[in-house]
Amino acid sequence: MASTDNRDDLIARLNAETAKIRWHELQKHYAAGNLLGVSADEDLIKIAIAFHQDETTRVKNWLASGSLFEVSDNQAQQWFKDDAELWAVVIPPFVLVQEVSH
């Protein structure tokens, strides 16, 4: 039962630490190579939990499927042009971002 409580606590903490942020505030993380995108059809928190728990196989599978991706220069330029607002959560050393669905 403790592991369920710990997982629930982790979910609550990550939800509380997730926020909308403008692209211009994320550019330094992109420039440092620490920014990863999460596709709109994935759960940002689920992926953040996998990073937090060092679930390497799951992370590699998401990278292979494109559900998790390195933000391309073209995407970064588009977000800059649009002054995009993104969901973001920090899982050191990474910042995971996901486009805000409208």
Where are these regions (language model features)?
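Generic serine detector
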Residues: 3, 39, 65-67, 72, ...
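Short, hydrophobic/π-rich interface segment
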Residues: 46-78
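Divalent-cation
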Residues: 19-22, 26, 57-59, 72, ...
